[in-house]
From Swiss-Prot:
Catalyses which reaction(s): L-seryl-[protein] + ATP = O-phospho-L-seryl-[protein] + ADP + H(+); L-threonyl-[protein] + ATP = O-phospho-L-threonyl-[protein] + ADP + H(+)
Keyword presence, Kinase: yes
Protein name: Serine/threonine-protein kinase nak1
Designated gene of the protein: nak1
UniProt organism field: Schizosaccharomyces pombe (strain 972 / ATCC 24843)
Protein kinase domain span: 10-264
Active site: D133
């Protein structure tokens, strides 16, 4: 155990995992005695790299506020000299990759792991985050069976320029084809491809092309058909992986759709407590003498190559916190046990005691000289950092000064805004002046400046919910700011934009440019003078028999004509009624006032006095009013037809 002072909020214990960019230790909160995981990153680097770290920690802060169950909980960040301590939840079960060493994982448990991972991906994708490193080593399982997604691109943000190319070469096995292809952008669907490779990895024990050289794997992923799961597996699992591994991104199912897939729904009633059996099986296997590959190899080979051909002197533990993403990264990143100014190195020996790795000794290096102009201090100068911060060794161990104390400074990062990314935007916009990249949604980093590559494929249109997110594009397309859509206004407020069908109920003698509420000539209700028991004539004049028109009906009002005849209004209700049978010689007797007719009320033109901005409400109310009037007109016509038939029968 490291001898920390009383001022330190956390006590760092044994090493539980190591990557090319940092290390993870088990720790204890001195206040609550809670077991936590401490990820230590060396920040003694350039200013732009520190800015990337600040942005990523700000993303973790946003995730902390959301308190999502399937995402590793972030407790805070502390500056210890030139080291950044990221405090997270500790998962005793380790990663899924480590649990696979005790034996194959059954399909029901695979479904549970994928279901919980999809819940996490659904949240971060809707929040505007691309994980970019989905694999079994980044999916943790707690002792109670809870699945946690971890490692949200801190290592990827640290790797810029030269290191970015190394990351690309070292970990191609989980990458989507659009990520590998030169000059092609990608979005959240790259994570869906990686999830399909992860499902393949859990089922078979290794990702596709695991035995190939990384350069060969890059070529195969970009130029061959997507891999398919073969062997003694269920058809539902094969279908799930095939729906993820589509070469064209827009053909892949998103996280919400995958949660509704048959393979996930088949085991939807299973509890996550079933995964505790997988953790217990691993503990039993280890107690029986099983040695994890992380103990044999140090850093686990994430590229899936044969472990017998790999050598490493990096120590790690059996808890399975494998965060390494670069196969040959030790030569490019400062060692976690020394700083950039150190000239001496010390090998850390370790012994296995009850499944944990406890360092015996470590060489304490001289701390670098204090420099107030360090980019780290300049970047976080607005944060609440105490003035007595002093650098320590790169491992985060307590380098005691003359008083034997080390300073801890909690970082309270500001939220992401445009000022944090102003320098990056200017660089990107100078390269891509023809594209409004600040509004491209969820676009990943561009592997090349060339935008005319023949290998580019069609971009997937993002889901409707995702399209509401506004991306403030930096180097790698991470955003957390939702976009507020503008107020939707009608395209025009003049009468020309209205339906011409209104002309069937309005007098069109007034010019069309006049305001709608000033139309006063309306089709008046059909007024019928009713009389009682007036017998119809028993004989009909021959001249009347050949005149089926209604011109002699004095009760029918005349409508003023217009230069342009309005189109008839085709009512939906009229389309469902049988055709009228009025055009017969018996029409003339019905032209008098001797039949009972239903009243038809006029259209309320006061609806047009409302503000034009409420056009949507006016349209709804007007549609209802028109349907009511048409219904009354149809009833009136049916009554007229019935009277006609009765009169015809009476005459006969």
């Amino acid at each position: 155990m490291e001898n920390n002072t009383a001022s330190s909020p956390y006590t760092k214990l044994e090493l539980v995992g190591r990557g090319s960019y940092g290390a993870v230790y088990r720790g204890i909160c001195n206040l609550t005695k809670e077991t936590v995981a401490i990820k230590i990153l060396n920040l003694d680097t350039d200013e732009d790299e520190v800015s990337d770290i600040q942005k990523e920690v700000a993303v973790l802060s946003e995730l902390k506020q959301s308190d999502v169950e399937n995402i590793i909980k972030y407790h805070g960040s502390y500056l210890v000299g030139t080291n950044l301590w990221i405090i997270m939840d500790y998962c005793h079960g380790g990663s899924v990759r480590t649990l696979m060493e005790a034996g194959p994982i059954s399909e029901p448990c695979i479904s549970l792991i994928l279901r919980e991972t999809l819940q996490a991906l659904k949240f971060i994708h809707h929040a505007g985050i691309i994980h970019r490193d989905i694999k079994a080593a980044n999916i943790l399982v707690s002792m109670s069976g809870n699945v946690k997604l971890c490692d949200f691109g801190v290592a990827a943000e640290l790797n810029i320029n030269r290191r970015k190319r190394i990351t690309f070469i070292g970990t191609p096995y989980w990458m989507a084809p659009e990520v590998i292809r030169d000059g092609q952008e990608y979005n959240v669907m790259a994570d869906i491809w990686s999830l399909g490779i992860t499902a393949y990895e859990i089922a078979t024990g290794s990702p596709p092309h695991a035995k190939e050289d990384p350069f060969r794997a890059v070529y195969l992923i970009a130029h061959t058909a997507p891999p398919r799961l073969n062997g003694n597996f269920s058809a539902l699992l094969k279908e799930f992986i095939a729906s993820c591994l589509q070469d064209v991104p827009q053909r892949r199912l998103d996280s919400s759709e995958l949660l509704k897939s048959k393979f996930i729904k088949q085991y939807s009633r299973m509890s996550i407590s079933e995964l505790t059996n997988v953790v217990k099986r691993y503990d039993t296997w280890q107690a029986a003498g099983g040695i994890p590959q992380t103990l044999l190899l140090g850093e686990e080979a994430d590229d899936g190559s044969d472990p017998d051909q790999e050598t490493s002197d990096t120590a790690a533990s059996d808890d399975g916190w494998e965060f390494g993403t670069i196969k040959q990264g030790q030569s490019n990143v400062s060692s976690i046990t020394g700083t950039s100014t150190s000239t001496t190195t010390a090998a850390t020996s370790s012994t296995t005691v009850t499944g944990t790795v406890i360092p015996k000794s470590s060489t304490v290096h001289e701390p670098p000289s204090s420099n107030d102009s360090h980019p780290l201090l300049q970047l976080f100068k607005d944060s609440k950092i105490s003035d007595d911060d002093s650098p320590s060794n790169a491992e985060g161990a307590s380098t005691e000064d003359s008083k034997g104390e080390v300073s801890y400074s909690q970082i309270e990062l500001p939220s992401l805004d445009s000022s944090n990314l102003s320098s990056k935007k200017s660089t990107i916009q100078s390269k891509h002046t023809k594209q409004a990249e600040d509004y491209d949604l969820f676009v990943g980093r561009t592997r090349s400046n060339s935008k005319t590559s023949s290998d580019q494929s069609i971009k997937r249109p993002l889901p409707r919910v995702v399209q509401r997110q506004k991306t403030s594009l930096g180097k790698r397309g991470i955003s957390m700011s939702p976009m507020k859509p503008g107020l939707r206004m009608p395209s025009s407020f003049d009468l020309q934009s209205r339906s011409i069908s209104m002309g069937a109920f309005e007098q069109l003698s007034t010019p069309l440019e006049a305001p709608a509420h000033k139309h006063s000539a309306v089709l008046q209700p059909l007024e019928v003078n009713r009389s009682i028991s007036i017998p119809p004539p028993k004989s009909i004049s021959p001249s009347i028999l050949h005149k089926p028109s209604l011109e002699s009906a004095s009760s029918t009002p005349k409508i003023s004509s217009c230069s342009s005849t309005p189109k008839p209004f085709n009512s939906k209700l009229r389309a469902h009624l049988p055709p009228l049978s009025i055009g017969s010689p018996a029409v003339q007797p019905l032209a008098n006032d001797n039949y009972d007719s239903l009243g038809v009320r006029g259209l309320n033109m006061e609806l047009f006095n409302d503000y034009p901005g409420n056009m949507h409400n006016i349209k709804s109310v007007l549609s209802l009013e028109i349907d009511i009037v048409l219904g009354e007109m149809d009833a009136c016509l049916k009554s007229l037809e019935c009277n006609l038939l009765n009169r015809k029968a009476y005459n006969e």
